[in-house]
């Protein structure tokens, strides 16, 4: 027995030693023509039988002993590629990616002697070059260069892409329902009850591999997009074993260690991005709240159960910080390849806005007066703390012609904010109001996706099943407004004073299944078909509570005073503060949506230089709604509110003017559906903007016809010149319209016919052609110019009289003013400009980047009656980022960055005829300085 143990031990030592001498050659073999992985390609050592074949993704892995080799890549009907001087190091992975050209004339093999490592930015351009769609994108390498910590900062550098409110993507000036975001090719729900689009700031760049923005439709894509589809790809497992850790700090002068910074005491788990329960409603939401006149002791108990903190507190803002960790590997077994990837990311950020303000102006009732009348100013300070963490765990197994992968993504964030402002009314009340606002918003997304890929001789099958669970929870939204009259604080409701608490909860479940089939039927021709099913369910409710005061004439201006024990109403005293239930049935609804889709398309060459992709997609959509109005006269119980069957044709043509130059054209039909909230009878009051959203159960979906033309020239790896034009025709375009009689009430309406025209230009160029000393420098810019037109005669501003927006605007013209019968679409930027200047040392251990972004004056809020339009003023964003690698094997890296170098402010202004622009809202985000350290183990 002892000899057996010794023998086994010796065998293990020998095996371990032998394995230690092994290294790996890994990479991907691509078909140059179609930019897809080459299936069944041969990879072997020249002059031997030692080798392997590529899988159906074009990937290969070849274990080799330490040494230098000549590697041969071959496949039937392709030019053979020979790569010399490939060095294999024990226990390390050598990456070698190659592109193979079709050998239609049986040309002789081509030999190269350089290592064909693929650059990530160049790879994105190669995908653009070979794609059947017009698209733009960003790689993880670009994320590193520009230094953005989350997707909302990074994606605005893509041609024609802007970000509204730091969260919402607009493609070609079209946002919300007109831009769709997918995660790993599958639909995901949004995290805002007021928006259709996904809040992209939930995606830290640390977990992302690339982002592709599809600007033209093809039948294999979702039909409900118009501006574009933003597909976010999370990191796949690496080709070699990697472990990395990064730590970051950032400061904004005037935020950190500022004695005036405000917030409030939160919960014990705020640092984890979720509430510990201390902000939850302290009693059952169905509990009956007695009327004060009943002198019921239960009223006192319920009032005292609320957290008494109502005012902001001065606190310390520490430097913002980030922490990320990643670990991944690819493991080769006999006939099986395993892989895994784990990415963890944590961020804690502070913001402080001094002199933050939002105001209300309107036109004078006298048409001879051009200057705008000041109705109300709201000026104060705002402090924020945002905690966000995410975790990505993925694994995959590949064997023969099959692979399976699973990916789990969890993103959690919590945002605390405190605002203290002075509101001054200039209307009939002329009141001065002191306002404290305390909020907490908790957002979470849990995404799981399983992907299977199979190659059955010629037939390729890919299926995906994705499940998403998301929640937006606003517990204990507190607003205390105190009026001041002759220096004395009062709780005068006539002046707009009051005490309110809101509890808002949105839960959404989304499951999608998708199957795609690809069948080649001729040389360079294939037929694709597939199907998809998507189910969405949303539950939404708001609980609203008002506090009143009885029998006390002298109060404090401190919001915490009202719920101090001695100031709470009791049955004996019948004086003090007490709670009033204010639940409105219209603030609660349930809705669901079913979508079944299928498509068929073909891709073929009509002539050697002209590729055509055409087909049709069918989508059947149903929406159901459960809810009621406040009076109970309208009741919906899982009632169908939408039932549409649409056929969406598409034609894409790609003409190769040369090997590196394409001319593209595309014609297709897409659509946009109303959101759950829009297609409802909900009436939801926003205590911050003081606007009431009113749903429209009769809202119809929007149908869009799209025409695109693009010329592109890929000069060298990483270099590009492109020019695009596009046109979009909207039928039943959806606009958020203010009521004629009450501009603070807004309702979504179908706005008839609208048109969008645009052009895009992009150039990326290395500057070595100027002089050899410019090697490593690169310059790039992209510009989008967009014009949109909404027919004012097709937009109705009331329900009964059918008054059009054009009639209402004409009625309120100033003397000498004339208007057109069209205006821009809301949110449509007339131009977008991005520019960058990069320097990267040939060794790649030093990179410096200066980037600039701006978008033109944009219609932000559509005016109504005497309320004029509100426009966003161009914000000039100039950023600097640099990193330096150092240490043993360059495993350490220091990154420094500066954002908003120009210290520009974000402004929105009222615009009137021959009138001075007046501030609607303004704040200064400040200049941020950051430093980050990365280490690769």
Regions found by a protein language model. Give the residues of each.
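Short, acidic, small-residue-rich periplasmic hinge/interaction motif at the N-terminus
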Residues: 30, 41-44, 74-76, 89, ...
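Short, acidic Ser/Thr/Gly-rich low-complexity loop/linker segments typical of extracellular
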Residues: 48-59, 696
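Periplasmic N-terminal accessory/gating domains of Gram-negative outer-membrane beta-barrel systems
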Residues: 87, 117-170, 176, 185-203, ...
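Surface-exposed extracellular loop regions of Gram-negative outer-membrane beta-barrel proteins
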Residues: 186-187, 421, 471-473, 490, ...
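Transmembrane beta-barrel wall of Gram-negative outer-membrane proteins
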Residues: 305-419, 443-450, 649-651
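Outer-membrane beta-barrel signature, preferentially recognizing the C-terminal barrel domain
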Residues: 430-451, 583-596, 642, 671-730, ...
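Conserved C-terminal beta-signal and adjacent last beta-strands/turns
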Residues: 499-506, 515-521, 526-527, 651, ...
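Gram-negative outer-membrane beta-barrel transporters
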Residues: 725-729, 747-858
